[in-house]
Amino acid sequence: MSTGSAGAAEAVSACPVSGLKLARAFWTQMGKPMIAAKYPQYAGRIAAGLVGHGSECYGFDDAYSQDHDFGPRFCLWLTDEDYAAIGEQLEVDYEALPRKFSVDAQGRVTFEAHARSDASGAFPSAGAGSPVTPRAQGANRRDGVFRIGDFFESITGYRTAPAQTAPHEWLMLQESTLAAATNGEVFADPTGLFSKTRQGFKNMPDDVRLALISKRLGMIAQAGQYNLPRSLKRGDGAAAWLSIHEFVQATASLVFLVNVPMVVGYMPYYKWQFAALRKLSGSMFALLPNVGEQLETVMRLSSAACYGGAGFGEGGKGAAPAIEKINDIVEQIAVDIVKELKREHLTTSGETFLEWQRPYVEDHIASDDPVLKSL
């Protein structure tokens, strides 16, 4: 972004409420009354909410999120039959909704049609929102009117979730893709059809979950317990750095899988991966609650460990202290993972080199489908 555009962005006051709160107010004050007035016979059939791509759908948006693709918006989800009857006109009416709003000192959002005569202390009118980027337009639009099947297909490639008996299809779906299809909030769903479809994507078959846990155990062992220390001994900082990346990704994913995505959600894409991991770790019911903080320590030390050299750091101690600390954390994480696998009766082995835990976990996979087993 150029200096000029950055200055312009900073000159606009940030909206003090989250995107989800703004979306719910927009639906309640503007969208729902419009549907009741113009489409009364369909009011009991249209689902509304905010799900999909965008920081606000994960609940992690902040002032920095508001310089693009931010503003009052929600989604309306229709059956194929209802979309054929009213979809195009409903989209026109949705786009015509007034989007100017104010936010008072208590955080209450008021849209223009509901503005009070006494506006003292209110947040200044925020207009229609920030500029919309090309990635959120056309076929990639993130709000408005959708067929239910089209909406999920645009995110996952599937109109409905793969069958519970189709593990190969589940394994082709990235966790971040499933996170985008199941995040956000549903404000209204009179028929329950949208929520049922969404729930299908939340309901990862347990055999698939166990297969993914096994895969993550393999990568944690390969990248963190094997290749990382060897790369550091060789002095290959680039290889060590990439090993840390693979180790962190696999370990973070394993934490979400162990906690069961149906309960805690899927791990989102890299930008919000650690925001979600911190939120999960802060839950009183979280499993492996300390792993996220341990991973952040590994990442903080990685520069010194991978590129510190012999004379780096306080007193010229070099990279050795950082390397030792990282290796200790990797092994402690492995110990904690084995304890959790034992607690869940997924293993009877105390072996902490996690590659050797994979057969024990895979013994609990009920299906004989070879895609679920390691080679």
Where are these regions (language model features)?
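Intrinsically disordered, low-complexity Ser/Thr/Pro/Gly-rich regulatory segments
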Residues: S2-G7, V12, F60, L76, ...
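Active-site nucleotide-donor binding segment shared across nucleotidyl transfer reactions
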Residues: M34-E81
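Helical scaffold of the NTase/Pol beta-like nucleotidyltransferase catalytic core
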Residues: S2-L50
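Conserved NTP/Mg2+-binding pocket subregion across the NTase superfamily
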Residues: A84-K233
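Conserved nucleotidyltransferase catalytic core and NTase-mimicking acidic/glycine-rich helix/loop elements
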Residues: W170-S374
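Hydrophobic, Leu/Ile/Phe/Ala-enriched alpha-helical segments that form helix-helix packing faces
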Residues: W27-Y39, L90-P98, I337, L341
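Catalytic or ion-translocation cores adjacent to nucleophile or general acid/base/metal-coordination motifs
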Residues: A23, W27, G44-A47, G54, ...
